[in-house]
Amino acid sequence: LEVFKYLPGTNTGDCGEATCMAFAARLIERSRDINECPHLLKDEFKEKYIELSKLLAPEIREVKIGVGDKAVTIGGEDVMYRHKLTFFNPTAYAFDVWDTMAESELIERVNKIQNFKKFYVGTFLTLDMIAIRSTSSNPDQFANTVKKVSETTDLPLILCSFNPDVLRSGLEIVGDKNPLIYAATKDNWIAVKDLALEYKVPVTLFSPMDLDTLKSLALTFQEFGIKDLVLDPGTYPSGSQLKSTFDNFIKLRRAGIEEDQKDIAFPIMATPITAWMIHEDPVSASYWETVVSSIFTVRYGDIMILHSIEPYALLPELHLRDNIYTDPRKPVSVDAGVNAIGNPDGESPVFVTANFALTYYTVESDLSSNSIDSYLVVVDTDGIGVESAVAGGQLNAKKIKETLDKFDFDVKEKTSHGTIVLPGLAARLQGDVEDETGLRVMVGPKDSGGIPKWMEKNWPPK
């Protein structure tokens, strides 16, 4: 109701919702944007628009880095714990290059970063950003590296140096691409502040193990009108200092969300790359970098700078991030239907599964990778896996028949065998499905990875 009173109340449906009350509900759950209401954009509603924007603003400020389709948004969180609502903007992973690399190595590494992708539960997991580090402290050399990187990729950039002259040389090349500059400290803040104002880019504030100074920097930058800030309280990758780092992240996030300290309610940066400063062995360094990045993906790291691009480091980081930023309010599901896997014909098997995304893509992958031409009947189980759906009644004989009817799939007409194959975990439905559909029903393996061996013994049906 608090949100509703700022809406026009005309119920025109121009926003895509039937009523303003429905639109208000969508605004609260952050599935719609106030700019989708054309009436709010009129001058007569200007004051209400401003007040509503303040009311709906997330507890942690959102900061946009980059431009175009590849731009990333960090922050924007409203809760300390995901189960209370959800987390909205996944941790942005930036991988480093440096200005003393040979040109061929630089371009090769940039391409590896921007081209990496891993298919996982219906989507591709990718890397988000590139952090360009100045190891030469030479403005011209840094500018040359920034130029080469920007010509090779359109991923958002972080320009990394404590030397304002070096940062300026990079901004002269890519200042119009909204990079994040790293970093302002208690020693260089005046010059970095001037750069942020001149180029209108977001800036990281760095104060290791000193939250009071970090807050002071944040207040100072805000007084100059700079709102797009990222906080780096320092990342120490081992021992008691790792615990202190962990505590500082929690203190910052709690201050922003639960204590309403808006002057420090900004995205937090972690730098797991620091593991490479204390471990000489590359495998150990990569291992601890992955450990640290995992810790702060779970606990309030909105953006990270990392080094390891080996699959053994990337996969756990990306899989963890994807799971942490899954919306617990919505089952991870796929559309119901009857899907052709490969090039099925009248002799091909007809498998049944649930529409829980992880189940579906596992089954689909097992069928595709083993070149099993088949039909896959996907039943709407409210995004619940097979075993739980059978127990809860979301997967039953009636629903299987309804799915076949809805998608006009006549098994007897499409196939010569008139048979469907249930998952092993749905074996108890066999008799009911036979009675409901009039089809022959077989029970497959409990795990779709066992389908090839099951096929050898049981297909075609005798």
Predicted regions and their residues:
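C-terminal amphipathic alpha-helical "assembly" element
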Residues: 436-438
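Non-heme iron-sulfur electron-transfer modules
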Residues: 25-55
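Alpha/beta catalytic cores of nucleotide-metabolism and tRNA/nucleoside-modifying enzymes
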Residues: 1-6, 34, 38, 44, ...
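Conserved mixed alpha/beta catalytic, RNA-binding, or beta-rich assembly cores of soluble enzyme
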Residues: 29, 81, 92-221, 227-425, ...
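Local cysteine-cluster metal-coordination motifs and their immediate loop/turn environment
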Residues: 8-26, 35-39
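N-terminal amphipathic alpha-helix/helix-capping segment at the start of soluble metabolic enzymes
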Residues: 1-9, 45-110, 336-344
